[in-house]
Regions:
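Active-site mouth loops of central-metabolism enzymes
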Residues: 18-34, 59-60
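Short, acidic/polar
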Residues: 27-45, 87-95, 202
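Short amphipathic alpha-helices and their capping/turn segments at secondary-structure boundaries
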Residues: 1-5, 36-43, 119-128
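A short, structured active-site edge motif that brings together acidic residues
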Residues: 8-20
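Beta/alpha (TIM)-barrel catalytic core signal, keyed to glycine-rich beta->alpha loops juxtaposed to Asp/Glu
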Residues: 57-224
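Acidic (Asp/Glu)-rich catalytic clusters
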Residues: 1-10, 41-46, 75, 96-100
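Active-site groove signature of glycoside hydrolases
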Residues: 41-60
Length: 224
C-alpha cells in the first residue's frame, strides 16, 4: 500500500531503542543500524524511508561525529532520505540541531510541559528544523477522562512509571504529579469554549506555536 502512494504519504519511523544493551556504541555501528533500516524497509514495503529518527539514545550519541557519519552513510545509500532525533531534553535537541543535516526533532510538549517553547522552538525555526510533538495529551491527562479513582493495567507505563521508576519520568504524564494535574485539568475544563473538547483544545494550543510541524497523539483503539 505505502509503495503505491509514496508520492502522497511520507513515512517516518524510529530506530535504536532495540539495541541491547542500550549503549551509545550501538548507534555508531553502521552494519547494525543498516540492518534495522533494512528490516523497516521490508516491514513497510517501501524503497526508502522519508524520515529516520534515532529513538531517545544515550545522551553522548547526540554530540558524537560517529552518529552523524552513520546517518549520512544511510542517506548516501538511498535507504533513508532524511534523519532526525527523538529526544528527552531540550539540551539534547539543541545539540542535535547544531548539525546541518538534522531535519527534525521529536520532543514532548504540551500544556503541562512548555520548556521547549522557551528556546528550542526559536532556534529550530531559524534552522528550518521540523518540530514533531509527542505526548501532546500528557499520557491521556489532557483528554479529561481521568479522575482520582482511575487505574491502569500493570503493564501500562502510567502504572509502573508514574514516579519515573522504569525510565524518564517526563515520558509519563509529562512528569506532572497525577493528582495535581487532575486539579489543573478541572480548571481547564471550566474555560473550554462551547463545542470543543479538552483534547481538541490541547492539540490546537500546540499547533498555535508556528515552530511546530506536526503533533502525534497516541491512540489505543479506533474510537481514539
Amino acid at each position: 500500500f505505502l509503495k503505491s502512494v509514496s508520492d502522497r504519504i511520507y513515512v517516518a519511523t524510529k530506530a535504536g531503542r532495540q539495541i541491547n544493551p542500550h549503549v551509545a556504541e550501538g548507534y555508531y555501528d553502521k552494519a547494525l543500524m543498516e540492518s534495522y533500516v533494512d528490516q523497516s524497509l521490508l516491514n513497510l514495503n517501501v524503497e526508502t524511508i522519508d524520515l529516520l529518527q534515532m529513538h531517545c539514545p544515550p545522551t553522548e550519541v547526540y554530540s558524537s561525529d560517529n552518529t552523524f557519519e552513520m546517518l549520512d552513510y544511510l542517506v548516501s545509500k538511498g535507504k533513508i532520505q532524511n534523519y532526525g532525533f527523538s529526544v528527552q531534553t531540550v539540551d539534547e535537541a539543541l545539540e542535535c540541531i547544531k548539525r546541518p543535516n538534522t531535519k527534525s526533532i521529536q520532543v514532548i510538549f504540551n500544556i503541562f510541559r512548555q520548556k521547549p517553547a522557551e528556546k528550542l522552538f526559536k532556534i529550530a525555526k531559524e534552522k528550518k528544523v521540523a518540530i514533531i510533538v509527542r505526548v501532546p495529551l500528557a499520557s491521556g491527562l489532557l483528554t479529561g477522562k481521568f479522575n482520582k479513582d482511575s487505574s491502569f493495567a500493570p503493564d501500562d507505563h502510567r502504572n509502573y512509571n508514574i514516579n519515573g521508576d522504569a525510565f524518564d519520568v517526563g515520558e509519563t504524564f509529562s512528569g506532572v504529579n497525577f493528582n495535581k494535574a487532575l486539579e489543573a485539568v478541572d480548571e481547564l475544563k471550566n474555560i473550554l469554549p462551547e463545542g470543543i473538547t479538552l483534547s481538541q483544545l490541547s492539540l490546537k494550543w500546540i499547533l498555535m506555536h508556528d515552530a511546530v510541524s506536526i503533533v502525534i497523539p497516541g491512540a489505543k483503539n479506533k474510537d481514539h
